Regions:
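Structured helix-beta-strand junction loops
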Residues: 35, 69, 150-151, 174, ...
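Hydrophobic faces of well-ordered beta-strands that scaffold small-molecule active sites
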Residues: 12-18, 37-41, 73-77, 111-113, ...
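N-terminal pre-domain/capping segments
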Residues: 1-98, 270-271
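Histidine-acidic metal/acid-base catalytic patches
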Residues: 2-13, 27-31, 82-85, 93, ...
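Active-site acidic/histidine proton-transfer and metal-coordination neighborhood
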Residues: 84-177, 240, 268-271
Length: 271
């Protein structure tokens, strides 16, 4: 285990995922609080009826740990579902609501949600949502909203293999927010710095991760110019939403933090 220390970046708010420590939720979070001020609780697999979710007893323990450590939460909602059919959409919505209700005790600032028609993506770019799919998803979001402390606490995440404007109609038609996943934009060979000003009014939080054969790897794999192209404008505008370093090992988290510090040094040297 590395010597614990809080990882912070001047002028930006960063956090880690609950997966940087390979353990069950409670022992993992006991370690995570030493490294970050904000933790993404990843509840990725709910099962058919929520049987795969964290237990209420574990949530109570996590609430106590976080209160003692002074850390904040965001929650990544289950991803093992989607809106391909009316029935799959109904099950997925029920599990999303279960996860929100279960974690309300933690008082998260954000719940992050995937909006997909098929939760097992193929290799090809997804088409835009059809009118029927859009209506199905909007009905689901209407059911989810009453379970939130405020509608903007739900952030819809952009995904790889989906058009960048895939979520535009949903965001404009609802009071919900965006989770800007920068790594997913890089994975498609696109430039997230071009999307930043377009999406800025709706961004609740960000996911940031590098690419090395696949995504969700350390930022130190990214060319300095690529990382600077998105981070330097954030410092320019005093970007305030949380940036979760969405990596799944402690080494990748610490190396990503170091890469951000080096980017900040380059930023300072130019100003």
């Amino acid at each position: 285990m590395k010597t614990p220390h809080k990882c912070r970046v001047p002028g930006l708010s960063i956090g880690c995922t609950s997966f940087i420590i390979p353990d069950y939720y409670v022992p993992a979070i006991r370690e995570c609080v030493h490294y970050a001020d904000d933790i993404a609780l990843l509840l990725l697999e709910a099962g058919d009826h929520g049987e795969g979710l964290i237990t209420p007893a574990e949530i109570r323990e996590l609430a106590g740990i976080a209160a003692d450590a002074g850390v904040k939460w965001n929650v990544h909602l289950p991803t093992d579902g989607g809106f391909a059919t009316e029935e799959s959409g109904r099950r997925y919505t029920e599990n999303i609501i279960r996860a929100i209700d279960l974690t309300r005790e933690l008082e998260p600032h954000t719940w992050v949600m995937h909006v997909v028609t098929d939760h097992i993506p193929g290799p090809d770019m997804r088409l835009h949502l059809t009118e029927r799919e859009t209506e199905r998803i909007l009905r689901s979001l209407e059911q989810i909203t009453p379970h939130l402390p405020a509608p903007e606490c739900l952030a819809l995440e952009n995904l790889e293999r989906h058009p960048t404007d895939y979520l535009d109609k949903l965001v404009s038609a609802t009071p919900h927010s965006r989770c800007f996943d920068i790594g997913h934009v890089w994975k498609e060979g696109l430039r997230p710095e071009e999307l930043l000003p377009l999406w800025l009014p709706d961004i609740r939080m960000c996911h940031l991760h590098g690419l090395e054969k696949r995504d969700h790897k350390s930022l130190h794999h990214m060319p300095a110019a690529t990382l600077d192209a998105i981070l330097h404008p954030m410092w320019d505008i005093r970007f305030s939403p949380l940036i979760t370093l969405e990596v799944f090992s402690l080494d990748d988290f610490l190396n990503s933090h170091q890469a951000m510090l080096e980017s900040h040094e380059r930023y300072i040297s130019k100003h």
